[in-house]
Amino acid sequence: MATPYVPVPMPIGNSASSFTTNRNQRSSSFGSVSTSSNSSKGQLEDSNMGNFKQTSVPDQMDNTSSVCSSPLIRTKFTGTASSIEYSTRPRDTEEQNPETVNWEDRPSTPTILGYEVMEERAKFTVYKILVKKTPEESWVVFRRYTDFSRLNDKLKEMFPGFRLALPPKRWFKDNYNADFLEDRQLGLQAFLQNLVAHKDIANCLAVREFLCLDDPPGPFDSLEESRAFCETLEETNYRLQKELLEKQKEMESLKKLLSEKQLHIDTLENRIRTLSLEPEESLDVSETEGEQILKVESSALEVDQDVLDEESRADNKPCLSFSEPENAVSEIEVAEVAYDAEED
């Protein structure tokens, strides 16, 4: 019995060619480097990433495609504050040629903020990396250890003379142990520092794609970027509330200190006022005492004068009484002398 022939529709014409076109995908929240690899392991990992949104840019062959006019929203960190920038320019106009980038335009050392174990379909760990292109502009990207490993392989091919230290893989033990993940995070941070320390490596295309330097991700490019944007806002809000609480406590302590100082000032003013009144009272007392002393002294002088007068009077009376007997004695003596002379 013959099997009936069932025609199978096949794409023809331009649709077939567009179906097989290799589209260059932009680095999204994570797995951007993984998507450029054709290894079976990379395909298996990328297939297990769940329903994470992947964004792409138009390829160079499709020049007639319309440019999306939706605004580009970027998260910016200015010092300790954050802001959102809305730009209506197409992203193609913002892309820069890596060959024309100067050494001074290289970004600062990316900082790994932490890691997260994802359990959508397959369990894996992603690392949250903060990239600062300029002090005013920064963004967050998510990368897996596989992305770091493939970037390291590319850099070995491009720069054979450089050997970048990448934390080794772990085959037999638990890859989700907290201590192990923290040690790996430190190793990946050292790997990123070595990337930025070399001029040629920091400006190569592989590193720029890895860090999304030419096309920074927006907060709504994927679910992970949106969540990272919300987490950034939450962290900023928490930090500002904490600073506000600390400032309020500091203000309360300063108010208390001010009241204590004011009380101390009032006490000192009262003491000064009291001390300023005491000399007047002492002067009054001294004046009265002086008058009394003068009166006493004057009375004492009067008494002394009276005593002296009495003494002088007493001295004068004996002198007068004794003067008469002296005259009498002299008269007697003269008389006696005269009498004796007559007898002779």
From Swiss-Prot:
A 1,2-diacyl-sn-glycero-3-phospho-(1D-myo-inositol-3-phosphate) binds at R144, T146, R184. The keyword Amino-acid biosynthesis does not apply. Detected in placenta, lung, liver,heart and pancreas. Residues 14-26, 41-66 have a biased composition (Polar residues). It is a peripheral membrane protein. Residues 1-66, 81-107 are annotated as: Disordered. Belongs to the sorting nexin family. This is Sorting nexin-16. It comes from Homo sapiens. The gene is SNX16.
